[in-house]
């Protein structure tokens, strides 16, 4: 079987100008980056704002194994299958971060015969959005340090600057650094650190902004530090939101590419779902809804993280809520949740499937709390057995959730036809009546309790000393009206990555709250989640190369 990159490189690409005609986009509406990538103009986005939105399908998953469960691949395959059965369809995905591409993932543009192309470009520098976000973020850091050096008119306490620098790489050695060393001309010495770009609030803002005006307003509202009197300092106090928006003026425009099957795809924005809100840009999703009859999008990691954040943070900023949710499950992940060791996942074990089903069942129950129709997609692997598949289908029938086998990795659009028909049926026969899990007026404690008890199945929320003080402080500043964004391990419902399945009788401990007032949410840090990842012992980068003619090797 060919590798993902071999499959991608074997597909003859069509000019992007031809691909986007399917959804009413003309060549004049595009800003081209070569023949196969483009950004959509503000003029076109504005011209479709009054169009009635089509159907929205959110793809999520059970708690994943370290290898992932093929959610992006399933999203792409489902979109292609919808196209194949005659539906006018668009895809709206996140763009990959170079850190994980070089680290453990090796690529994030789908897989097999369900990929977005050109995959090498998408996985590397693409249209430069990540670099623009990194530059805007670090420009703000430079402006803060310059303000300190030039007299500190705002009275910023250098010990209480909460704006770290960022880099789109996994580099654990930069988590904590000292800046300003050497001499007085090098600035004010202080503690600093680096996060990965996809954890940046600038990334979150870009993905939640509805236009340039909204982008600038959100940038102005970023909290960067506290004064000596402990009052917050905002970007608007530095008067640099215009400069930051200028750096991002092209990055905010959604990127257009194509799938192997020729479905038009927006690939734009890429916040992580374990340390950020995990969804592609509002601008891309909203525009896709107004151009196509069906839009397929995804939210990162399992439904306890990405889907919860999509429904509580992103959906209020969209023209409409999802009409259906697809939960991707794999038998290998269910067996792992059922207690099987990673080395034994290829062996048949129906008992472990039954035991691990508790994880999938809780995700189904959680999405039902939002009143949205659900379809379970079994992402098929060659090691799956008929007996295991039959058991899973029977278990899904017991909780009255439709389930379909999908083999889009191996068969592309053809492998997703049954799933596409099931999703259309769910949308047609059931009506979504979306409701949020909590209200804006609820306190931060109430919002966190709702997520922990209703979504995670936990017993209670515990607050560390720092978080306790921040709850009082944030309420005084009026930030308690914002939604919450949990920073938590993706592998478990709990904050313990080793606690698999559907655990209960556990508490979640919030160690720190981080204000993301520009993005419009409060991040709650749990466990030992890092906002700057490290590289594994054998990084994917060690298998990458480029040939003398410029052909990429080793991406997957």
Swiss-Prot record:
Question: What EC number(s) does its UniProt record assign?
Answer: 6.3.4.3
Q: Which Pfam families match?
A: FTHFS
The record, for InterPro entries, names: Formate_THF_ligase, Formate_THF_ligase_CS, P-loop_NTPase
Which EC class, in a word?
A: ligase
Secreted as UniProt keyword:
no
Pathways per UniProt: One-carbon metabolism; tetrahydrofolate interconversion
Record-level GO BP terms? tetrahydrofolate interconversion
Binding-site list for ATP: 65-72
* Molecular function per GO: ATP binding; formate-tetrahydrofolate ligase activity
Q: Per the UniProt record, which residue ranges are transmembrane?
A: none
Q: Which reaction does it catalyse?
A: (6S)-5,6,7,8-tetrahydrofolate + formate + ATP = (6R)-10-formyltetrahydrofolate + ADP + phosphate
User: Which keywords label this protein?
Assistant: ATP-binding, Ligase, Nucleotide-binding, One-carbon metabolism
Assigned protein family: Belongs to the formate--tetrahydrofolate ligase family.
This protein is called what? Answer: Formate--tetrahydrofolate ligase
Q: Which gene encodes it?
A: fhs
